[in-house]
Amino acid sequence: MEKNDKEKRELTIEDLPGVGDATAEKLRESGYDDIMTIAVASPKDLAEISGIAEGAAIKIINAARKYADVGNFETGEEILNKRKEIKKLTTGSSNLDNLLGGGLETQSITEFFGEFGSGKTQIMHQLAVNATMPVEKNGFDSDVLIIDTENTFRPERIIQMARAKDLDPDQTLERIHVARAYNSHHQILLAEKAADMAREYKIRLLIVDSLTSHFRSEYVGRGSLAERQQLLNRHMHDLLKFGTIYNAVIAVTNQVSANPAVFFGDPMNPIGGNIVGHTATFRIYLRKAKAGKRIARLIDSPYLPEGETVITITESGITDGEK
């Protein structure tokens, strides 16, 4: 695996059949500057963005997939070996880490949803700090991207959390790159541009806080539901593609709405319907408890059982709570 991976990295897009200097320049200008980025693209997107014919795009993508060894059947053992590349980011709470099988996985989308004040944004701030920590402290020693849709990022909170981890606050803030998204289309554009940042910095964590707020406010009523879901689907797949290509954690927050038809049990449902439900790899429901505590329930995972635990939000950040 290591030898093959090294060989893949040494290949350039000029090695692809049909990609000369002019085509390579178009592809690079459009953000397709390596084999893997092209291999996971769709022919339509590649053709539209780079200005090449769709037939040529299909040939280029097929060649890239062959070189990158993606899109083919693999044995379970081969997939298991590939999963050794997966890294896990600590949440700051051993309770929550254990619930997630060791922390947040790279190459996956982890969704935290809950009511206002349930701790979603606090966890995002903590993850941002933790990602900058050294590897020996269960961090990634990496930079972080945050797409802030509700103006909730607070550098003062980062400073508090960094000091609690014995990190230099100024250096920590320097490694966290924040972009304010003003509408859903701007949010989608920022996710697409994240790859440009990943080529300049080592990015192992991309946060979207919150995922659905703009979509929810801009697309109101059943008449606009189909368009909203289509855009949201594209956005989430862009995020997942980024996580796969750059071996990064994708952490998103989501809002909830009450179902008035539910008379027994919890009426709260996350926004986004099946699109978010099917695309998010891990889904965690946060609820308020007493004395700064929050109940975190894992409700969906490809391989972990459902379960819940207690975390505490303090001035120092996210810590364990008493069960």
UniProtKB/Swiss-Prot annotation:
User: Which InterPro entries has this protein been placed in?
Assistant: AAA+_ATPase, DNA_recomb/repair_Rad51_C, DNA_recomb/repair_RadA, DNA_recomb/repair_RecA-like, DNA_repair_Rad51/TF_NusA_a-hlx, Hlx-hairpin-Hlx_DNA-bd_motif, P-loop_NTPase, RecA_ATP-bd
SMART domains xrefs: AAA (SM00382), HhH1 (SM00278)
Keyword ATP-binding included in the entry's annotation: yes
Mind listing the GO biological process terms from this record? Answer: DNA recombination; DNA repair
Keywords, alphabetical: ATP-binding, DNA damage, DNA recombination, DNA-binding, Nucleotide-binding
Covalent S-S links between cysteines: none
Question: Annotated Gene Ontology MF terms?
Answer: ATP binding; ATP hydrolysis activity; ATP-dependent DNA damage sensor activity; damaged DNA binding
Tell me which PROSITE patterns the record gives: RECA_2 (PS50162), RECA_3 (PS50163)
Q: Coiled coil: which residue ranges?
A: none
Q: Which domain of life is it from?
A: Archaea
**Amino-acid positions noted as binding ATP in the UniProt annotation, renumbered to this chain:** 114-121
Q: Could you tell me which HAMAP family the record lists for this protein?
A: RadA_arch (MF_00348)
The record's similarity note reads: Belongs to the eukaryotic RecA-like protein family.
NCBIfam families attached to this UniProt entry? PRK04301.1 (NF003301), recomb_radA (TIGR02236)
Matching entries from PANTHER family are given as:
MEIOTIC RECOMBINATION PROTEIN DMC1_LIM15 HOMOLOG (PTHR22942:SF30), RECA/RAD51/RADA DNA STRAND-PAIRING FAMILY MEMBER (PTHR22942)
Functional note: Involved in DNA repair and in homologous recombination. Binds and assemble on single-stranded DNA to form a nucleoprotein filament. Hydrolyzes ATP in a ssDNA-dependent manner and promotes DNA strand exchange between homologous DNA molecules.
Q: What is this protein called?
A: DNA repair and recombination protein RadA
What gene is this protein translated from?
radA
